[in-house]
A protein has these predicted regions:
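Regulatory sensory and allosteric helical modules in signal-transduction proteins
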Residues: 60, 68-118
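A short, aliphatic-rich beta-strand micro-motif
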Residues: 124-131
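Amphipathic alpha-helical "output/dimerization" segments
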Residues: 150-168
Protein backbone atom coordinates (compact mmCIF):
# COMPACT_ATOMS: atom_id res chain seq x y z
CA UNK A 1 0.00 0.00 0.00
CA UNK A 2 1.22 3.48 -0.74
CA UNK A 3 4.38 4.57 -2.50
CA UNK A 4 7.57 2.64 -1.82
CA UNK A 5 9.34 4.20 1.13
CA UNK A 6 6.13 5.69 2.55
CA UNK A 7 4.47 4.21 5.59
CA UNK A 8 0.73 3.67 5.50
CA UNK A 9 -1.26 3.52 8.70
CA UNK A 10 -4.62 1.86 9.18
CA UNK A 11 -5.73 4.81 11.29
CA UNK A 12 -4.73 7.40 8.68
CA UNK A 13 -8.35 8.29 8.02
CA UNK A 14 -8.90 11.83 6.85
CA UNK A 15 -12.00 13.82 7.68
CA UNK A 16 -14.01 14.76 4.63
CA UNK A 17 -15.56 18.21 4.38
CA UNK A 18 -18.63 18.24 2.18
CA UNK A 19 -22.28 19.25 2.29
CA UNK A 20 -23.11 16.23 0.10
CA UNK A 21 -24.24 13.60 2.60
CA UNK A 22 -24.32 10.84 -0.01
CA UNK A 23 -20.67 11.52 -0.85
CA UNK A 24 -19.80 11.66 2.86
CA UNK A 25 -21.46 8.34 3.69
CA UNK A 26 -19.94 6.66 0.63
CA UNK A 27 -16.52 7.75 1.89
CA UNK A 28 -17.27 6.56 5.42
CA UNK A 29 -18.48 3.18 4.17
CA UNK A 30 -15.35 2.77 2.07
CA UNK A 31 -13.27 3.39 5.20
CA UNK A 32 -15.42 0.95 7.20
CA UNK A 33 -14.89 -1.73 4.57
CA UNK A 34 -11.14 -1.23 4.79
CA UNK A 35 -11.23 -1.59 8.56
CA UNK A 36 -13.38 -4.72 8.83
CA UNK A 37 -13.24 -6.67 5.56
CA UNK A 38 -10.43 -9.01 6.64
CA UNK A 39 -10.98 -9.02 10.40
CA UNK A 40 -13.02 -11.95 11.73
CA UNK A 41 -13.36 -10.67 15.31
CA UNK A 42 -16.75 -9.07 15.97
CA UNK A 43 -15.54 -7.04 18.96
CA UNK A 44 -12.68 -5.51 16.98
CA UNK A 45 -15.02 -4.69 14.09
CA UNK A 46 -17.74 -3.04 16.15
CA UNK A 47 -15.09 -1.15 18.14
CA UNK A 48 -13.51 0.21 14.96
CA UNK A 49 -16.93 0.99 13.49
CA UNK A 50 -17.91 3.08 16.52
CA UNK A 51 -14.51 4.82 16.49
CA UNK A 52 -14.95 5.63 12.79
CA UNK A 53 -18.38 7.17 13.42
CA UNK A 54 -16.93 9.19 16.32
CA UNK A 55 -14.04 10.41 14.18
CA UNK A 56 -15.99 11.37 11.07
CA UNK A 57 -19.44 12.52 12.17
CA UNK A 58 -19.75 16.14 13.29
CA UNK A 59 -21.89 17.31 16.18
CA UNK A 60 -22.37 13.98 17.95
CA UNK A 61 -21.84 13.10 21.60
CA UNK A 62 -22.32 9.30 21.47
CA UNK A 63 -21.96 6.61 18.81
CA UNK A 64 -22.14 2.90 19.34
CA UNK A 65 -23.99 -0.36 19.41
CA UNK A 66 -26.46 -2.24 21.52
CA UNK A 67 -26.55 -5.98 20.86
CA UNK A 68 -29.65 -8.14 21.09
CA UNK A 69 -29.10 -10.79 23.76
CA UNK A 70 -31.54 -12.75 25.89
CA UNK A 71 -34.53 -10.70 24.76
CA UNK A 72 -33.04 -7.26 25.47
CA UNK A 73 -30.47 -4.80 24.14
CA UNK A 74 -27.09 -4.94 25.88
CA UNK A 75 -24.44 -2.24 25.56
CA UNK A 76 -21.73 -3.02 23.02
CA UNK A 77 -18.72 -1.08 21.72
CA UNK A 78 -19.19 2.70 21.71
CA UNK A 79 -17.53 6.11 21.86
CA UNK A 80 -18.76 8.76 24.28
CA UNK A 81 -19.83 8.98 27.92
CA UNK A 82 -20.75 5.82 29.85
CA UNK A 83 -24.19 4.58 28.84
CA UNK A 84 -27.14 2.52 29.99
CA UNK A 85 -26.12 -1.14 29.90
CA UNK A 86 -29.52 -2.78 29.34
CA UNK A 87 -32.53 -1.54 27.36
CA UNK A 88 -35.80 -3.43 27.16
CA UNK A 89 -37.27 -4.00 23.71
CA UNK A 90 -39.86 -1.27 23.13
CA UNK A 91 -38.31 1.18 25.62
CA UNK A 92 -36.74 4.43 24.48
CA UNK A 93 -35.53 5.16 20.97
CA UNK A 94 -33.25 2.09 20.81
CA UNK A 95 -35.90 -0.29 22.11
CA UNK A 96 -38.48 1.15 19.70
CA UNK A 97 -36.15 0.70 16.71
CA UNK A 98 -35.47 -2.87 17.82
CA UNK A 99 -39.16 -3.69 18.32
CA UNK A 100 -40.35 -2.13 15.06
CA UNK A 101 -37.23 -3.01 13.03
CA UNK A 102 -37.36 0.53 11.65
CA UNK A 103 -34.86 3.38 11.77
CA UNK A 104 -35.84 6.06 14.26
CA UNK A 105 -34.89 9.65 13.40
CA UNK A 106 -35.68 11.75 16.47
CA UNK A 107 -35.23 15.47 15.94
CA UNK A 108 -35.92 16.33 19.61
CA UNK A 109 -35.46 13.53 22.15
CA UNK A 110 -37.44 15.47 24.77
CA UNK A 111 -40.56 14.99 22.64
CA UNK A 112 -40.05 11.22 22.25
CA UNK A 113 -42.31 9.30 24.65
CA UNK A 114 -40.22 7.19 27.01
CA UNK A 115 -36.85 8.56 25.89
CA UNK A 116 -34.02 7.12 28.00
CA UNK A 117 -31.61 9.93 28.89
CA UNK A 118 -28.13 8.45 29.35
CA UNK A 119 -26.54 11.86 28.64
CA UNK A 120 -28.43 15.04 29.53
CA UNK A 121 -26.64 16.83 26.68
CA UNK A 122 -28.35 14.71 24.00
CA UNK A 123 -30.95 16.63 22.00
CA UNK A 124 -31.47 14.42 18.94
CA UNK A 125 -30.87 10.78 18.11
CA UNK A 126 -30.86 8.29 15.27
CA UNK A 127 -31.11 4.54 15.77
CA UNK A 128 -30.75 2.00 12.96
CA UNK A 129 -31.76 -1.61 13.64
CA UNK A 130 -29.22 -4.22 12.60
CA UNK A 131 -31.09 -7.10 10.99
CA UNK A 132 -29.17 -10.03 9.50
CA UNK A 133 -30.92 -12.88 7.70
CA UNK A 134 -34.24 -11.71 9.11
CA UNK A 135 -33.05 -11.68 12.74
CA UNK A 136 -32.42 -8.70 15.01
CA UNK A 137 -28.72 -8.50 15.92
CA UNK A 138 -28.81 -5.13 17.64
CA UNK A 139 -28.96 -1.42 16.89
CA UNK A 140 -26.61 1.35 15.87
CA UNK A 141 -27.27 4.36 18.10
CA UNK A 142 -25.96 7.91 17.58
CA UNK A 143 -26.79 10.92 19.77
CA UNK A 144 -26.21 14.61 19.18
CA UNK A 145 -26.25 17.67 21.44
CA UNK A 146 -27.92 19.54 18.54
CA UNK A 147 -31.67 19.41 17.89
CA UNK A 148 -32.61 18.23 14.38
CA UNK A 149 -29.06 16.98 13.76
CA UNK A 150 -30.24 13.91 11.83
CA UNK A 151 -32.46 13.61 8.77
CA UNK A 152 -33.50 11.07 6.15
CA UNK A 153 -30.18 11.45 4.30
CA UNK A 154 -28.42 10.36 7.50
CA UNK A 155 -30.86 7.46 7.87
CA UNK A 156 -30.09 6.32 4.32
CA UNK A 157 -26.32 6.68 4.78
CA UNK A 158 -26.29 4.90 8.13
CA UNK A 159 -28.42 2.08 6.71
CA UNK A 160 -25.63 1.56 4.16
CA UNK A 161 -23.15 1.58 7.07
CA UNK A 162 -25.16 -1.22 8.73
CA UNK A 163 -25.36 -3.05 5.38
CA UNK A 164 -21.56 -2.91 5.18
CA UNK A 165 -21.31 -4.34 8.70
CA UNK A 166 -23.69 -7.15 7.73
CA UNK A 167 -21.62 -7.96 4.67
CA UNK A 168 -18.45 -8.66 6.68
CA UNK A 169 -19.58 -9.51 10.22
CA UNK A 170 -19.93 -13.04 11.54
CA UNK A 171 -22.91 -12.44 13.80
CA UNK A 172 -23.03 -16.10 14.86
CA UNK A 173 -20.12 -15.43 17.23
CA UNK A 174 -22.15 -12.85 19.16
CA UNK A 175 -25.61 -14.36 19.65
Amino acid sequence: MGIKGEETYVNDIKRIVTDDKEKFYNYMNLKLTGLICEEPDWLANLSNASALLWLLLDEINWAGFYLYKNGELVLGPFQGKPACTHIAIGNGVCGTAARDLETQVVKDVHLFPGHIACDAASQSEIVVPIVHEGKLMGVLDIDSPIKERFDEADAKGLQKFVDTLNKYMDWSKIV
